[in-house]
Amino acid sequence: MKKYWLILPGLLALFLLFLLTRGPLSLRRLDDHPLYVMHYAGDYAFDDYLRTGIYPDQPITPVETDETEAWGCTTFAALSMDGERLLGRNFDWYADHPALLLFTDPPGGYASVAMVDLSYLGYRGDEIGMFERAALAHAPYLPFDGMNEKGVAVGMMAVPFGNGTLDPALRTLEDVEIIRLVLDYAASVDQAVELLENYNVRFNPEVPLHYLIADAGGDSAVVEYVGGELRVLRNEQPWQVATNFIISTQAPRGATASCWRYNKAFQALADAQGALSGPQALTLLESVSQAGSFPTIWSVVYNLTSGEVSVVMDRNYQQIYTFHLKRTDTP
C-alpha cells in the first residue's frame, strides 16, 4: 500500500500537466480582444453525436445574440499550381465577441485547427477564470472556419436566404456543425461534398449560411442550400471567392457582383491567377476588411500546403499570430 502512496503525487502531477497543456486548462490569452488559444486533447464524442443525434454530457444551447443584421464575411481560395494553396477569411461581426483558436485531434478523425466565436458559449470580453471553463468542452462543436491535417479548409458566410435539406432519412446537423463534420472526416473537397450529402442542415432562420471549401490538391467549392436542395459550385479557375450573396442563383461574371468585397477579392485573385503568398493573402484580406458597426473581428489565412495558420485580430495587420498544424499526406 505504501508504494501506491509514493507514486500518487507523481500521477497527480502528470494529470495536472495534461490538463494544463492539453485541455480546458491549457487556455491561453494572447491579446486584449481577447483572442485565446487552446489544445483540446482526446474525444469530444462527435462521432457518437453523428450516430445518435445526442450531445455528450448535455445539450449545447448557444447563447442568443441579435442576428437581425447579416455577417459581412469574405472568404477566398488561392489555388495556383505555381505556389502554395491558401484559404483566407475575414469574419465580420460584433466587435466585443471573444475568439478562440482551437486545436483538436480526435480519435478516428483528423487533427484540425479552427476559429470559434466564444460569445456563443456565453463568454464575453472578461478574463475566463479557471472555474469558468466548463463550456469550453463544447467548443469543438462551434467552429466558424478551420483547416485539417489533410489540407482541407472551410469558411462560412451569411446569406440573405437559404433552406437546409429536410430528408427524413438523414440526421440533421446545425449550421456550424457541418464545418466540424468536414474538418474531422474529409481529406478532399470531393469527400466533403459526399459527407454533406448524407446529412440535413438546420440554419438559424435569421442568418442562413453558405460555405467555401478548399483542399491542398487545388479544388474548391461553394456549397449552398436553396429550396431544400444542396447546390455545389466548383472552382473553374485556380481561385474562388464567396461573400454574402447566393451564387447559385445569381452567379456574377468576373468581378461584377453587387458586393464590393467580392469584386475586389475576385479581381486581385484573377490578376494573380490564384498565386498568392501568405503575406499577400493577408494584404488582400486587409483590403476587404471593414470598420463600423460590424467590423472585421479576425482575419485568418490557412496554408493548405504547409499547415501554417496566420491570425490577425481587430484589423491590426502589424500584429500577426502564427501557428502550425502538422500536415499529413492526402491519400
List each model region and its residues.
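Single-pass type I membrane protein transmembrane segment
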Residues: 9-10
